[in-house]
Amino acid sequence: MVASNLTLQQRGWFDVLDDWLKRDRFVFVGWSGLLLFPTAYLAIGGWLTGTTFVTSWYTHGLASSYLEGANFLTAAVSTPADAMGHSLLLLWGPEAQGDFIRWCQLGGLWAFVALHGAFALIGFMLRQFELARLIGIRPYNAIAFSGPIAVFVSVFLIYPLGQSSWFFAPSFGVAAIFRFLLFLQGFHNWTLNPFHMMGVAGILGGALLSAIHGVTVENTLYQDGEQANTFKAFDSTQEEETYSMVTANRFWSQIFGIAFSNKRWLHFFMLFVPVMGLWTSSIGIIGLALNLRAYDFVSQEIRASEDPEFETFYTKNILLNEGLRAWLAPVDQPHENFVFPEEVLPRGNAL
């Protein structure tokens, strides 16, 4: 008894805190939780505050809050004014000077949500690393989650850092994200970018693989019985697999002429496809931050300009992009006071 008390007394505060953080509880905390929970709480709270009360009139000339009449699809926490450049927009910084209302008007909430959101995602990834380490499994969950982190950081942070200001990042809202997608298409021809193509293939391919895998397992479940390994429930200690890999292999071999014969390769492939899609999309967005162009089929553009009867889907899309730029820019960037003469504006076929 005395020895145990001495042991407890000799333990430092770090060991005591370590034990408390890693204690088995309903919601695991861990060291990663010290980063995750405060930053996630502040990011979500900042977003809810902004979408409820804060206008975008001073930054975008828009109404963007429930208080102004926006709904869930049109409300947003908008990016800071273009004049703010890449300032961190700290509440106590030279722009707001501690004035909370002025800070909100300048777009400080966006910087607040973006910064804390990025750290929250990193905290969630570290949480998966930490828990995997504690229970003795491999860290592929955390590695896979690097995909969403890469997309968030590239889209919300790296892209605007490559442009003139935070203004050109996406605002945090549904319709605001759609505006950003149209902007990427009109100004960067994003859909023709090979990294976007790889991203689409990865995400849709991952969804397809997930659906195929799910139905295959469902289709090859053992018939329920009363035996130890096939009773009407799942037992974490059962000796055999719950579904028949052999039957699944035979089925897909007949359908496609080829099938996975190894579970590890199958599941790694299901991990690899969507994560690579996210990574390649992120690389593409970094390219856009540097204003790198996608494919330019100049020969088709030259021929289309010389021959009125020659047009391809590519040349049609280029014209659509010109229309997007001409009509989007004056509305999207009202502070620039763009005025385009009528003769250079695109006209629809009906006109």
Swiss-Prot record:
Its EC number is 1.10.3.9. Pheophytin a binds at residues 128, 141. The chain crosses the membrane at residues 39-59, 123-139, 151-164, 206-226, 277-293. Chlorophyll a PD2 binds at residue 196. Keywords: Chlorophyll, Chromophore, Electron transport, Host membrane, Host thylakoid, Iron, Magnesium, Membrane, Metal-binding, Oxidoreductase, Photosynthesis, Photosystem II, Transmembrane, Transmembrane helix, Transport. It catalyses: 2 a plastoquinone + 4 hnu + 2 H2O = 2 a plastoquinol + O2. This is Photosystem II D2 protein. It comes from Synechococcus phage S-RSM2. The gene is psbD.
